[in-house]
Amino acid sequence: MMDARCIVNAGEFQKALEKVLKVAPKKCSIPALMEVLVRFDGDACTLTCTDLELWCQASIPAEGGSCAFVLAGSRRLLTACKFLPGELEFSYRKGQPPEHAPTKTDLDGDLWISCGGKEICQRVTAAEEFPELPDVEAEHTYTVQTASLRKRFERIKYALSDDSIRPCNQCVKFFDNRIGAVDGHRLAMNRDEALCVDAPFHIPPGAMRLLPVFEGADCQLLVGKRRAAFDSGDIRIITKLPEGESLDFDAAIPRHYPEGYTVNISDFVGNLQYLEKFISNPSREPIRFNGGVLLLHTKSGDYRSRLDMEDAPRQEIGFRASYMLDGLQQFQAKKLDTVSMQMNTPVSPIILTDQVDTALVLPFYLNRAA
């Protein structure tokens, strides 16, 4: 029999366990994917989870020997960790492979976890049952301020597509100093000179949603042909990259706007939220914007609300209330008071911008509205 004894700080282990479990599926036909791979290697303990598309790995200091196993009941252990202060001691005994070809059961082992007067003893799965961590052959490497990138993603994620036929549109596009999202009805993007990429690529939203695990620390973004990784040394997120092309953002945004106005964001949002209460069929009941007045016609009645604007549009344009609200809230998240609204014709996209963030909302064709 092979034995190993390892020690970690209980609080650090709980924190790392909570981070990596964000990736593990709660239900899966492959049992190992619902659990955490734990690997001790002398002075480090590394925890890994995956759903085969996305990987999350966290390392913490450790003492002791070397061993690896797949936990049983990882989420229950996470809950139990709050009752285990101080040091956690892991004692692992792996089954000795027989002379004949070993079976899965032969390679499984026994694990004891002790802390003070508390002890857990359970059968655990052999590390060989867990998928191997993929390599990221980086062609480009960038330094990322995760706190800033997280905020930028939160502002634009509303425009991500759910169309699986176009996987790139389900992802965040990184191009020059910008990131963007588009779903066919809306477009959202923002820029930051601190992160400028050499060639466009697309990061799935699952990886972007994991940025909080870095707790604001800077990391390296490694981009290859098939995979990308956010890596701070202690935390690593690996994701597959989608194949195909996405929208050319610059080609989609009109360059000439004969009409431009400054709108008060909270005033516009409040008036839209008021009118939205009377909408029963969003796909057939647009907001009409004419002369600074928001108009809504429904089967139950007509409703209007006037915006606080010094200069009002000279042409009528229609839009879906929820789409415009999403665009305005992109700027509201930055705690801005006003934003520039730019329009071309009643059938051209409506642009909201502060020169750093941009939101595009497609118009509603009013000749079909009634």
Predicted features and spans:
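Structural preference for solvent-exposed beta-strand-turn elements
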Residues: M1-A370
